[in-house]
């Protein structure tokens, strides 16, 4: 069956963007391909599957900058970007399954505020169990990983994953805040943000 799936990567980091991806394709083919939640795959597996997904499906994504994330409620921003991606589809499809970061009913209402295209919206917790959502999670993760590598190349700093649970990320923030500042989410509820002005 051909329909759409949406998922994101990078909601939780303190460094780097969030990426939201939409994949429209054949669920049966994706199942046979071995598509599953990106968190359950190695980097090499994600890259390999990414190439197959892009070749055989319609793929759209948006890279959401830290500065934009700082300006909005994260769920509202994610819903708006998701709706924009769906609105950009020219193909007629039956429905789109979307991984929900909150109660599915609430998230659906957020999306519908911005949706212009006539399509059935299905929001789910643990949406990655759906092959199209899983494919979107792979696309989002691969694109975000590439964006993180670009930041490392531009700054010359290996800050690890960008997540606050990563010791390398914490250390990099303490040592190189001035350089990393354009890529940092200022409103992240993380104790080091209280001390960021110490490094200005």
From Swiss-Prot:
Subcellular location: Cytoplasm
PROSITE patterns in alphabetical order: RNASE_H_2
GO biological process assignments: DNA replication, removal of RNA primer; mismatch repair
Free-text comment on the cofactor: Manganese or magnesium. Binds 1 divalent metal ion per monomer in the absence of substrate. May bind a second metal ion after substrate binding.
Chain residues that bind a divalent metal cation: 7-8, 99
Predominant subcellular localization, coarse grouping: cytoplasm
Record flagged with keyword Nucleotide-binding: no
CDD domains membership: RNase_HII_archaea_like
GO MF term (any one): manganese ion binding
Catalytic activity, as annotated: Endonucleolytic cleavage to 5'-phosphomonoester
Function: Endonuclease that specifically degrades the RNA of RNA-DNA hybrids.
HAMAP family: RNase_HII_A
Family the entry assigns: Belongs to the RNase HII family.
Protein name: Ribonuclease HII
């Amino acid at each position: 069956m051909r329909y759409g799936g949406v998922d994101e990567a990078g909601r939780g980091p303190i460094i780097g963007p969030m990426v939201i991806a939409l994949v429209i394709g054949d669920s049966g083919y994706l199942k046979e391909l071995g598509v599953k939640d990106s968190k359950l795959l190695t980097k090499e597996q994600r890259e390999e599957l990414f190439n197959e997904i892009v070749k055989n499906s319609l793929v759209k994504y948006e890279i959401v900058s830290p500065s934009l994330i700082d300006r909005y409620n994260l769920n509202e921003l994610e819903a708006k970007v998701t709706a924009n991606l769906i609105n950009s589809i020219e193909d007629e499809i039956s429905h789109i399954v979307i991984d929900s970061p909150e109660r599915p009913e609430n998230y659906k209402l957020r999306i519908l505020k911005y949706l212009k295209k006539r399509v059935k919206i299905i929001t789910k917790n643990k949406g990655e169990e759906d092959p199209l959502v899983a494919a979107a999670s792979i696309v989002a993760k691969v694109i975000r990983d590439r964006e993180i590598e670009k930041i490392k190349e531009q700054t010359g700093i290996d800050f690890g994953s960008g997540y606050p649970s990563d010791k390398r990320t914490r250390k990099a923030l303490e040592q190189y805040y001035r350089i990393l500042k354009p890529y940092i989410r200022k409103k992240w509820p993380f104790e080091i943000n209280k001390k960021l002005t110490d490094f200005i």
